[in-house]
Amino acid sequence: FLSLIPSLVSGAVSLVKK
């Protein structure tokens, strides 16, 4: 599960920067 966190964080960051 921990390996999925980076992808989730990067996705959230991309939405915030959007």
UniProtKB/Swiss-Prot annotation:
Tissues where this protein is expressed: Expressed by the skin glands.
Keyword entries, A-Z: Amphibian defense peptide, Antimicrobial, Immunity, Innate immunity, Secreted
GO cellular component: extracellular region
Post-translational note: One shorter peptide due to unspecific cleavage of this peptide has also been identified.
Subcellular location per the Swiss-Prot or TrEMBL entry: Secreted
Keyword Signal: no
Gene Ontology terms describing biological process: innate immune response
Function field: Antimicrobial peptide with low activity against Leishmania species (L.amazonensis and L.infantum). Shows low cytotoxicity against mammalian cells in models of peritoneal macrophages.
Similarity remark: Belongs to the frog skin active peptide (FSAP) family. Phylloseptin subfamily.
Designated name of the protein: Phylloseptin-N2
Species classification: Eukaryota, Metazoa, Chordata, Craniata, Vertebrata
